[in-house]
Amino acid sequence: MDRVQQLEEIHSQSLELFKKKNQDYGDAFAKYGTLGVLVRISDKLQRFQSITKNQITLVEDEKLEDTLLDLHNYSAMALMLLKEN
């Protein structure tokens, strides 16, 4: 699998995750605008640092890959909000 195919797979996984979370949360990310998304990105970066530094996750159902997919989606959400303004 080449890099383009790998990126397509990541986009596909991220889109499916976005759809599931969007069903649960709706358009909640837009409520607080880009600053709200920045806070969530900061939370995920902290989680990324914690996982990579400690090599363990205390939240068993959230792996490093999940955190990175969330970061991918939060970046996309920020882009959506920027395009709306």
Where are the language model's segments positioned?
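Intrinsically disordered, low-complexity regulatory regions
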Residues: 1-85
